[in-house]
Amino acid sequence: MTVLIHVLGSDIPHHNHTVLRFFNDTLAATSEHAREFMVAGEDNGFTESCPALSLRFYGSKKALAQAVIAKAKANRRQRFFFHGQFNTSLWLALLSGGIKPAQFYWHIWGADLYEVSHGLKFRLFYPLRRIAQGRVGGVFATRGDLSYFARQHPGVRGELLYFPTRMDPSLNAMAKERQRAGKLTILVGNSGDRSNQHIAALRAVYQQFGDTVNVVVPMGYPANNQAYIDEVRQAGLALFSAENLQILSEKMEFDTYLALLRQCDLGYFIFARQQGIGTLCLLIQADIPCVLNRDNPFWQDMAEQHLPVLFTTDDLNEQVVREAQRQLASVDKSGITFFSPNYLQPWHNALRIAAGEAE
């Protein structure tokens, strides 16, 4: 039997760390198809912290792609599970036959599904990528992303699967300990990545609430982002008084970030695609409602779980936010499909499907 190989094809340390730790701690002990990884980027201590996994690291996305293609050609029974945002060479290999459809299973993280960049090289590449995506053996994704993908590629198998957000189920009831009143605190974006469209989001928050709320913008990730942070700070201070604007430029440990989220009353996410599911889960767990772009299909997942959804086009005020908080507080968090531990069984199913052991 040929063991499934997992591919992290882009050097995205935060996401790669989450996936590797999840597989090491949760899946590797029960499935031989959860142990082999090819990773773009440096080791960064992963080998030591994930002893249950067999990890191979590659210095560039191109080097990783060449290694994957070589393995695919050498053994056509070899199957690969591609996680999230990977690279151009892998899509082109699928398009050219270097990797066959039956070898290619893809967990959609969002960015590789949507065509949001206006750069010329991206606009030229998107049609090729779209054709290639129609040739994958199967996809795994959120409900909203499955719906989006199926409209373009109705013949490709799709299965529900959620990114393994680090969550402590014992915290599901913790939010009820806090009494929410007074000035609203609004979280804008889930990281310092430009895809959060921070400046547009700050303007939207100001248009809805004016300079009457506390605004928190976490921008400690990714690194080497100071010029953009300064740009966002300048734009924010043109709208909000200094005491109402908090731009966080330092990377935070998980527990610190969790404590920050739990001080918020509302999350505001203007991006028009599915991303930041980890932050959304942690906010929902704390009874903090989220404002989404109507073009972000994750609202379908939230609605399916009977969670209140606010949109950027809604008329928002404190009363609307407090009512959404009340509705969230009445939801039994233990039944939410994309919460831990409920997302575990779909992962076991996904491994069997990608490995060819399940119909």
From Swiss-Prot:
Is Membrane one of the keywords? Answer: yes
Q: What is an example of a GO molecular function annotated in this UniProt entry?
A: fucosyltransferase activity
- Record-listed E.C. numbers: 2.4.1.325
Keywords linked to the UniProt accession: Cell inner membrane, Cell membrane, Glycosyltransferase, Membrane, Transferase
Under Pfam families, the record lists: Glyco_transf_56
Q: Does the keyword Nucleotide-binding apply?
A: no
The record's catalysed reaction(s) read:
beta-D-ManNAcA-(1->4)-alpha-D-GlcNAc-di-trans,octa-cis-undecaprenyl diphosphate + dTDP-4-acetamido-4,6-dideoxy-alpha-D-galactose = alpha-D-FucNAc4-(1->4)-beta-D-ManNAcA-(1->4)-D-GlcNAc-undecaprenyl diphosphate + dTDP + H(+)
InterPro entries to which the protein is assigned, alphabetical: WecF
Q: Which domain of life is it from?
A: Bacteria
- Give the HAMAP family listed for this entry: WecF_RffT (MF_01002)
Q: What is this protein called?
A: TDP-N-acetylfucosamine:lipid II N-acetylfucosaminyltransferase
Q: Which organism was this protein described from?
A: Salmonella paratyphi B (strain ATCC BAA-1250 / SPB7)
Its gene is wecF
